[in-house]
Amino acid sequence: MEMTHYEKTPLIRQVFNNGKTNSWFYVKHEILQPGGSFKSRGIGHLIRKNNEEALSEGSGKLAVFSSSGGNAGLAAATACRSMALNCSVVVPKTTKPRMVKKIQSAGAKVIIHGDHWGEADEYLRHELMAQESQHGSKTLYVHPFDNETIWEGHSTIVDEIIEQLKENDISLPRVKALVCSVGGGGLFSGIIKGLERNHLAEKIPVVAVETAGCDVLNKSLKKGSPVTLEKLTSVATSLGSPYIASFAFESFNKYGCKSVVLSDQDVLATCLRYADDYNFIVEPACGASLHLCYHPEILEDILEQKIYEDDIVIIIACGGSCMTYEDFVKASSTLNVS
């Protein structure tokens, strides 16, 4: 039986101990994807689409290359395993050994090179891929987020949500917001694409959540044009992109989306609390969106409206495998998180 590169994930109503008696929040659990995050959707779609094209052209199977030592690299590795493709992932020296092992366990060849992602990426594209091309193989470079085909894959999350709401007899006008974390804008762009396809982009506001130190979208919005961050300082390393995808920036302004920036302390506290409440370990990038479940006043403030008992808010729990519970405890101690 052929494996699929992503799974339909549950949309679960969760009641949070936030001082209010409500059942607003429906959480989409992308942590249950084969690669542990939403990235399985888009990156898997990119790889599958290009592999099908290569086979139809008679070029043989693809050789796939990724330069992410995080969730994108793991998504590429798991997608390639499902299609029996060779996958090479170049990671910088800063990559945690447990992530290297995870990517290797998914069947990818891992090369450690460079002091940061930029050096790993350059080595991958200019050295490794060039060598493979000389051998006559058709190669595919997998960017972590900035690719329209990747967004197309991520957009399936919206189709699923609409289907699942219908199954639960929940009408779309009850949905007052869709909340997602933003790094480089891949997930956000996919959500916008999905909302556009379903004629909902102007009806359901998207709340984009970032952490201070990785808040490239918020800083770009304040400047009025995309900026590049020279330094990334947040504990939410999976949100650590130096730039925001152009489509994400343009769509934010076009559809009147909302921006929230949280502190590392707030996000770490939420991750620990969520683990205690639900026995799910989510990394800070995911905890950023879940933070609004524990603090609905932030949501009401940014939406400039009261959210009532019959209203629904969709939270994308984007997943991620970059931190363990021990990592949270250590980081929380360093940042004096109570």
Swiss-Prot record:
Domain of life from the UniProt record: Eukaryota
GO molecular function: L-serine ammonia-lyase activity; pyridoxal phosphate binding; threonine deaminase activity
Residues recorded with modification N6-(pyridoxal phosphate)lysine: K39
Keyword DNA repair: no
Enzyme Commission number(s) of this protein: 4.3.1.17
GO terms under cellular component: cytoplasm
Catalysed reactions, as listed in the record: L-serine = pyruvate + NH4(+)
Pathway assignment: Carbohydrate biosynthesis; gluconeogenesis
UniProt keyword Translocase present: no
Cofactor(s) for this UniProt protein: pyridoxal 5'-phosphate
Pfam families: PALP
Family statement drawn from the similarity comment of this UniProt entry: Belongs to the serine/threonine dehydratase family.
Protein name: L-serine dehydratase
